[in-house]
Amino acid sequence: MRLPTLTFEQLDARQKETWSKHAERRDKPVGPYLTWLHSPDLMDKVSPLSNYFRFDCNLPVRLREFGLCVVSRFWDAQYSWSAHVDKAIAAGVPADVMKDIAAGRKPSFKADDERIYYTFAMEILESHFVSEKTFDEARKHFGEKALVDLIGAVGYFSMLSIVLNASETDLNREPPFADVRGYKKT
């Protein structure tokens, strides 16, 4: 980790307040929160957004975890991939789909919602735009409310991935991607 990992005892009053608010919904800060804790005002703004996309948005848990992994792989964010790949599989995403994504291959999807989510996310991430066909298919399948949540989730998960990579958040596991070692492409 490029920034010091702060213990509760090292925090100033403002950081302790933020830590305590965070602990109401989750345990102690880990992953990106270890970085955000250095800016408690930012962490106070990001935490509710994170909670929304992780726990409360209009997409099923399976697609929340799947989407987080799709975006994490795009950004080579090993920490978030490692923290969520097993959750995605436990929620019902086939392990072979996750293996393909980890290897940088487009999976053969059995579930339409996973295929639509993946196609939408990869279009916006790779080209910065979404085709009319992909947008219309996603709107028809998910409905407008869940589609807007999907768009927001791709943006939030991108921010999360960037924070994890820029701060080089400790992985504490075997690297999940064959083409990434440390925080560099091989």
Q: Across the structure, where does each feature detected by a protein language model lie?
A:
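Hydrophobic alpha-helical segments
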Residues: M1-T186
